[in-house]
């Protein structure tokens, strides 16, 4: 038997030739690039020895700068200095303006309503800005490694939805990079710590970066990384600490004018410096806009206490989803520069009952994990036994009759995954079916999020329930969803890749999960009522057709009894008593049993007419 060597598409198959691959942590505040050299994963520094690259781009008519050079222009040219662009990825203009009303640069809508940033270099979208950051990181890598990159792994928050993930991939392609995989940031951290320490058991990854918070509960066992549950907030991070402290300094300094963007930037820079200093000192002196004052760690802790508490509430929900007690967690991995804040480490340690792990630089750990994964995917570790299993954050399903949601892939299912279910037609002669893809945890369509719609046409005209449509949901390793519907007898099919024009609002995911628990009993009752109403409609429609076709099989008295039963069913079906509807359906079934038997006898006689006993 011939042996086939299977390699990553687009990569050279030359044996024993080490390929150049990097992991990129594309962060809200800072970004990093890392690689594996001599068996060790390490982040790559610039010519000045700096590993972090500020996720900031400054645009001018004659060109742009990225990183530290760009950040120095933030105070003197804020309108052309773009930072925290990751928060805009996959979002609508309206959403951005509502969530971040004090941005120092001008935004306007493109033709399709997506955000464009007005700069001296022209109108730019968030994908272009992200691409410029990725180009800078790639240039650092190629200069350091002295060769072209064969592939990259880019990390994204676990809560990024399809639009945000797709936007990240588009930015990478615009930067000329071959994306091996998008990797959830907490999972990347687990790879870094899992390989270094060889831990087995349940681990919590607490990731508090500049713009997002993620909590992941993972089980590490014999090289398998399985995410048991995820949670968090896609718009909570160290940036929020900075803004709270900046507002506090503004109040203390008596600065009332919020329209002066230069002063706003100075306040923010002062807040960032103070936050960093307070990680080591109990107090720090602040000088801004002609004001000098002292900020203590206790004052800072009081400002951010509510935000830290929000992260712990998300931790509690994630543990519940994973069916794990805090006492079962062996280690807590701290990720993100904001986890250097003493109050964060203190509260997290109290919550889990153990000292968090910080042996790997929390700024670098995600990039290091991504580099390890990139090294494997590019083919440099063909004997690796590590298996990576991510999860989807919210259930995926379809709308069915009655406005119900039929879940096809439950939340926290590991990916990549493919699941299929069969559905059937509701009406006689139905030749098309509308497929409505939903996301969420509730039972009714009105309480879930619409992802996409498409139609399957060319279904054979058969009696209701005669056609069988197989709907397949496939989620790839990057969390992108492809839905295919196929009529089984003819093979006719239609499909769609879900790429929403913009993502979820900041609190929508957490709210959807919380609501599913709060309204669980109410939702079950609503679903039962909707199901009974759908069944009543099916029975009435089917019976109406039967009475039209075979009324002659009934006496006048029999017809009157059936008419009374159906009339009663119509009345109760218009009300909201599921039990009453169920009883009315049973009554109709009882009163029509003889009629159904006669119709069956008639059908058999027609089918056997003209045939001999031997033929039968």
UniProtKB/Swiss-Prot annotation:
Keywords: ATP-binding, Chaperone, Nucleotide-binding. NCBIfam families: HscA, PRK05183.1. PROSITE patterns: HSP70_1, HSP70_2, HSP70_3. The keyword Nucleotide-binding applies. Transmembrane segments: none annotated. Belongs to the heat shock protein 70 family. InterPro entries: ATPase_NBD (IPR043129), Heat_shock_70_CS (IPR018181), HscA_NBD (IPR042039), HSP70_C_sf (IPR029048), HSP70_peptide-bd_sf (IPR029047), Hsp_70_fam (IPR013126), ISC_FeS_clus_asmbl_HscA (IPR010236). GO terms for molecular function: ATP binding; ATP hydrolysis activity; ATP-dependent protein folding chaperone; unfolded protein binding. It holds the Pfam family HSP70. One of its GO terms (biological process) is iron-sulfur cluster assembly. This is Chaperone protein HscA. Chaperone involved in the maturation of iron-sulfur cluster-containing proteins. Has a low intrinsic ATPase activity which is markedly stimulated by HscB. Involved in the maturation of IscU.
């Amino acid at each position: 038997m011939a042996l086939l060597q299977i390699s990553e598409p687009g990569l050279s198959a030359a044996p024993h030739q080490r390929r150049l691959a990097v992991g990129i942590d594309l962060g809200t505040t800072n970004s990093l690039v890392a690689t594996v050299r001599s068996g060790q994963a390490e982040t790559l520094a610039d010519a000045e020895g700096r590993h972090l690259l500020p996720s900031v781009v400054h645009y001018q008519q004659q060109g742009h700068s990225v990183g530290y050079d760009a950040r120095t222009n933030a105070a003197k040219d804020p309108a052309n200095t773009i930072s925290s662009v990751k928060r805009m990825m996959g979002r609508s203009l309206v959403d951005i303006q509502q969530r971040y009303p004090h941005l120092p640069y001008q935004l306007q809508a493109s033709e399709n309503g997506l955000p464009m940033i007005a700069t001296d270099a022209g109108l730019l979208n968030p994908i272009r800005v992200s691409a410029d950051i990725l180009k800078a990181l790639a240039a650092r890598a190629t200069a350091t490694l002295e060769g072209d990159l064969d592939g990259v792994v880019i990390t994204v928050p676990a809560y990024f939805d399809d639009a945000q993930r797709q936007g990240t991939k588009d930015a990478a392609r615009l930067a000329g990079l071959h994306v091996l995989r998008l990797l959830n940031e907490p999972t990347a951290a687990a790879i870094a710590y899992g390989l270094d320490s060889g831990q087995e058991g349940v681990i919590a990854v607490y990731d508090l970066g500049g713009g997002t918070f993620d909590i992941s509960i993972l089980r590490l066992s014999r090289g398998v990384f399985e995410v048991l549950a995820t949670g968090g907030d896609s718009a909570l991070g160290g940036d929020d600490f900075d803004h709270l402290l900046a507002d506090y300094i503004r109040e203390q300094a008596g600065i009332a004018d919020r329209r002066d963007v230069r002063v706003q930037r100075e306040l923010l820079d002062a807040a960032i410096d103070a936050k960093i200093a307070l990680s080591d000192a109990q107090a720090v002196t602040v000088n801004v806009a002609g004001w000098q004052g002292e900020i203590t760690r206790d004052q800072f802790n009081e400002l951010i206490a509510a935000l830290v508490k929000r992260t712990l509430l998300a931790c509690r929900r994630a543990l519940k989803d994973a069916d794990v007690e805090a006492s079962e967690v062996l280690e807590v991995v701290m990720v993100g520069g904001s986890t250097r804040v003493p109050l964060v480490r203190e509260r997290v340690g109290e919550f889990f009952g153990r000292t968090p792990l910080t042996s790997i630089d929390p700024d670098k750990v995600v990039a290091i994990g991504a580099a390890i994964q990139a090294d494997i995917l590019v083919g440099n570790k063909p004997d690796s036994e590590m298996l990576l299993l991510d999860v989807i954050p919210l259930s995926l399903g379809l709308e069915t009759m009655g406005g119900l949601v039929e879940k096809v892939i439950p939340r926290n299912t590991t990916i990549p995954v493919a699941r299929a279910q069969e559905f059937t037609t509701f009406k006689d002669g139905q030749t098309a079916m509308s497929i409505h893809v939903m996301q969420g945890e509730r039972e009714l369509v009105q309480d879930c999020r619409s992802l996409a719609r498409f139609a399957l046409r060319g279904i054979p005209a058969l009696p209701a329930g005669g056609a069988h449509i197989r709907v397949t949901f496939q989620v790839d390793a990057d969390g992108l969803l492809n839905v295919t519907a196929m009529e089984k007898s003819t093979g006719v099919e239609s499909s769609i890749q879900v790429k929403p024009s913009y993502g979820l609002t900041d609190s929508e995911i957490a709210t959807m999960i919380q609501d599913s628990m709060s309204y669980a009993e109410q939702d079950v009752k609503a679903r039962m009522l909707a199901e009974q109403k759908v069944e009543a409609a099916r029975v009435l429609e089917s019976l109406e057709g039967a009475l039209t076709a075979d009324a002659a099989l009934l006496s006048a008295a029999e017809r009157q009894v059936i008419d009374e039963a159906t009339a009663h069913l119509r009345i109760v079906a218009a009300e909201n008593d599921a039990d009453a509807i169920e009883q009315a359906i049973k009554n109709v079934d009882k009163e029509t049993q003889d009629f159904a038997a006669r119709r069956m006898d008639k059908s058999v006689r027609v089918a056997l007419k003209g045939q001999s006993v031997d033929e039968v």
